[in-house]
Regions:
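Condensing-enzyme catalytic core of the thiolase-fold
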Residues: 1-160
């Protein structure tokens, strides 16, 4: 949690905060993000153990991708298309799935004029390299519901 609260609706032209106090990822009306607080816990258990114990399995983590594109980008907090392409392709390869196999992508989707186009272009490049099909995969971001939960943003996306 942000304590003491030192942020709010503090829009400045050219910044990452929303002009109207709403977060609209991948939307032409999106003008930035809104920060919020949150917490999330994801309990992980090996699939074989969960099945053995009769647990309800909500999801399976089949693969991961992790990288840092360092100085080859606009700023420390701004991703590059090339770095995003590499990490998305890495995650698909690690999971053993093709982009065409997916029906939903939960994106970071901050609704910023810098971040969303980079993320969308990277996804488009990876998907287009695999298939010419269109309209089979939905793109979303939990930030449209709860804003950018800062340190809990990754957990919120996984939980969604």
């Amino acid at each position: 949690l942000t304590v003491p609260t030192n942020s709010g609706h503090l829009y400045q032209e050219g910044g990452m905060l929303s002009r109207d106090g709403s977060t609209r990822p991948f939307d032409a009306a999106g003008s930035g993000t809104v920060f919020s607080d949150g917490a999330g816990v994801v309990a992980l258990k090996r699939l074989a153990d969960a099945l053995r114990d009769g647990d309800t399995v909500h999801a399976v983590v089949r693969g991961v991708g992790l990288n840092n594109d360092g100085a080859r980008k606009a700023s420390f907090t701004a991703p590059s298309v090339e770095g995003q392409v590499a990490v998305i392709a890495m995650a698909h390869a690690d999971a053993g799935v093709r982009p065409r196999d997916l029906s939903y992508v939960e994106a970071h989707g901050t609704a910023t004029p810098l971040g969303d186009p980079v993320e969308f272009e990277a996804l488009a490049r990876v998907f287009r390299a695999d298939t010419a099909d269109a309209g089979f995969c939905t793109l979303g971001s939990v930030k449209s519901n709860v804003g950018h939960t800062v340190t809990a943003a990754g957990a919120a996306g996984v939980i969604k």
